[in-house]
Amino acid sequence: MRINRTIFFILITFSILVGLQAIAAESHTINAEARRFVADIVHIQVGDSVAWINMTSHNTVSIDGMIPEGAEPWRSDMGENYQLTLNVEGVYAYVCEPHLGFGMVGLIVVGEPTNLEKVREVASKLVGPYRRIIGKLKKVSAPK
């Protein structure tokens, strides 16, 4: 009987902790304006969500080599609002493909920017309007 109580207590404790983590997760909004994302740099915690809204003539696409190792790349449908939960710590760079030439790029920093140097290295080799991401990377501090 004592074993059943112990197992029950462990299960209840685990359920509460999982529930608290879900409650603590936040949703952050990125607004797609005519030719820019507002906010263009977002700092969030692991497990938080990002929602892109007002995507009438926009999409959001992660940039190859500029997301953390083990993270899933994404490509939203054109004209559709999009939501993504990020569970891997690091820097994520993304663009709006139709408006890339206008500098419509953004960064999401999840927890500590553990892959910042790798992302900066990839950014240094970008050409054309993709290079606009470099200015945004200068605003991100290296992990402590």
Task: For every predicted segment, state its role.
Residues 1-9:
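Bacterial N-terminal signal peptides that target proteins for export
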Residues 19-144:
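Extracytoplasmic copper-binding redox domains, predominantly the cupredoxin/blue-copper superfamily
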Residues 9-18:
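Bacterial N-terminal signal peptides
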